[in-house]
Amino acid sequence: MRSPRFCSFLRPLLLLTALFLLLLPAVGTAQRPAAETGGRWSLRPGVGYTVGALVPTPLPAELRSIAHYSPVGGLRFGADAVYHTGGRVDLSLGAYFTDRGMDSEVRVAGYRTRVVRGAQQLSGYFFGTNATRARLRGLFVPLALRYPLGRCTLTGGAYLEWYSLRQFSGTASDGYLRVERPTGDKVLFGPKNDGSATYDFSDALNDSGFGVHLGAEYPLSPRFLLNAQLTWGLTPAFDGSFTAVPTPLHPLGFTLGVNYVIGGGR
């Protein structure tokens, strides 16, 4: 018997594949000059580096300052299969391994969360420094329309992701927690690794996501393409029912990479 997780993986992938097949005849109605067309299909293996973040939307009122941010991970590799329609717009479907994340440190005031200190599990309103490491690693499947514009090609569409590694953990330090309510008992937290509290919400992260992407390609040579892509996750990192992170966090990524064209046209 198939597990619910397998079904949740398979259904969106089948829908994306069906959408790809349905779009094949639709995007080729306006004919491109014969000189600009080659074979119907091309394969484009590629590698790139992704800078990622989980962006709160909207920015929480409890955020006072951002002391530190740096990307974690970043490698992306895989391939796009491009269908050259003979029209003005081509179509592609890709599959990539993706690995992105961030380290961040912020000051907050009155931020509702849940932490562990020693043997105690505490929830309430935190005032102090919040340090987080977030990471998402897995399969990235983009569906794109491709529109040549001069020497460049503009790309845009939707994507699905499934995560084999999910991490969202950190520390609460240099402050205090009001237990359960804003006027609750005050629990003091010392510096990091010296009286601070910890949290790990990795298991609560969604194991898949849906989003949109926009990018561009530029030919470095007849076969090598430089590409840039911006992705925005429409699916929040946590479900709305998860209260330890009250503000919706959306995956954001920017990738710069190179692809090699095998067969087909541009």
Per-region residue spans from a language model:
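Short glycine/proline- and aromatic-enriched beta-strand/turn motifs that initiate or cap beta-hairpins
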Residues: 29-82, 153, 205, 261-266
